[in-house]
Amino acid sequence: MTIASLRHYDFIVTGASGNVGRHLVPLLARGGRTVLAVGRDLDTLRKLFTDQPHVEVASYDALAGLTACDTLVHLAVRNNDTRGSLADFIEVNVDFAMRIANEFKRMNGRRFLNIASILSLDEDDQSPYAVSKAMGVQAIRELVGKRLDNVHIGYFHDGGYFGEKLRMLAAFGPAVGSAFFAMFKMLKPTTSAQSLADYALGPAHALPHPEILTDDLSDALLYRALTRMLDIGVALAIMLLLAPVFAAIWVAIRLDSPGPAIFAQERVGAAQAPFTLYKFRTMKHGTASAGTHEVSASAVTRLGAFLRRTKLDELPQAINLLRGTMTLVGPRPCLYSQTELVEAREALGVYTLKPGITGYAQIRAIDMSQPLVLARADYRYKMLRSLLLDLRIILATARGRGGGDRVAAPDRP
């Protein structure tokens, strides 16, 4: 390990002495790839990477002496766990980021990999960190254009390193520490150092917008077990405690309009497998099978409008919960005839999830009349899902946020 001696590196990593950089740099250097670790404190960088023969270190001023760059990984940031005014955050997350981007542009770099926290994705977050990161991304994009590759990561970890906030887990040994961390992963999206390194070593722009890189919960047995228990518990509670409500709605529907009280329809399930969805009927018997937003409002019965508004029409989906064809939180199931939505969800990997009674998109009032927007919201949930997010979505639904799909305007005579 030496001070910068080459004029071209496979990777330049800014903020290399931070929690992410110190674990990412050695992974990037495997296989003989040359890495320049850049930071403000050269002594710290030397100590961190002294045993890495393909890693060299430099201060930020040394970037001016480089003539070429392949990939620049930008980690230097004023993070959300530090205090300061908006001006303080802009100084690092915008002005300093622009300085780095200008050096990258001068070197005619191929890829500017900008790493940010998933916290910066929250549209409602007006904290100095979130605001400054959004400004920084826009400023970098104006300088480097399509060479900018944004990636949003979750809580960072690496093997026996469980992140700064959970570093005490290492004292319990790898087995116990990993077991506790597995429980933590249910509560918060996480990102491993290896997955970030793999992305940096792979092709640019390989992630769908909004470029989220988190650990997959599909194989998290504890998360799956707890969500399944929650599904069954809620389903049984609905069917046992609300039996009189079921009966009253059934009778009211039969009296309100001709036709069965229960509406059964084939929908697209996990892995695009068909399943039968059950709801209380809210439309006139014989209404064409189509997306709700494609059906005229005149097809909705008087009682149906009330049931849809209060979400009582979805109570029979307790049957789907018990059968395991649906879960409490997930993408709302669509029809096979809604090809634009089906194809968009397939492209984003959404069908690895079970459909849900409520979901991330639903509480944001995104329905099936916006298929591409809906698919992207479903993808965002897939990448951000956790037990805490599921509970927040359930509580938001209980408080009345979101609703069913909009229906089309009434037919004109």
Task: Provide a role label for each language-model segment.
Residues 54-95, 103, 119-124:
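NAD(P)H-binding glycine-rich loop region in Rossmannoid oxidoreductase-like domains
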Residues 9-31:
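N-terminal Rossmann NAD(P)H-binding glycine-rich loop of SDR-like oxidoreductase domains
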Residues 126-152:
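Active-site Tyr-X1-5-Lys
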Residues 219-285, 393-413:
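A hydrophobic, helix-centered structural microdomain
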Residues 121-128, 149-179:
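Flexible, glycine-rich beta-alpha linker
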Residues 98-131, 149:
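Conserved Rossmann-fold NAD(P)-dependent oxidoreductase catalytic core, especially the SDR/UDP-sugar
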Residues 294-353, 394-397:
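A short, structured surface patch at a secondary-structure boundary
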Residues 350-413:
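C-terminal terminal-structure detector
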